Amino acid sequence: AYAADALLEVSRSRPRLFPIIADARHPARYAGTVEADLSWLIQDVASAEQAQIATANRRFLADDGMSMIFIKPRSIDATASPSTVFADVEAELTDTYEITARVSMDTTHEDHRAIIAKVR
């Protein structure tokens, strides 16, 4: 609940930030509240289906849109090494996104990575 509260608080002063507090695995459920042709989509979920969620939510991005996807390997596969999980997630994203940057989050979140990607 803290993360959702913090996101809502930040969005109050940013009129172009639209927080979605919903099950990201089901974009059809919140499609009516999301603008089309977004320039950016930021995904920060803890789910084994992070790559599939990013692919499903691509529908909201403009053709030149960008996505920032926070990858949490232990949420995807607690038995695999983080590097293996990162590689697997990136492979799943390649049909939908071109990865332009990888940013380690180790200074604040061990074994987390942010992937910056543009729509293919």
Regions found by a protein language model. Give the residues of each.
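S-adenosyl-L-methionine
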Residues: 1-50
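C-terminal substrate-binding/active-site "lid" region of AdoMet-derived donor-dependent transferases
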Residues: 3-13, 55-119
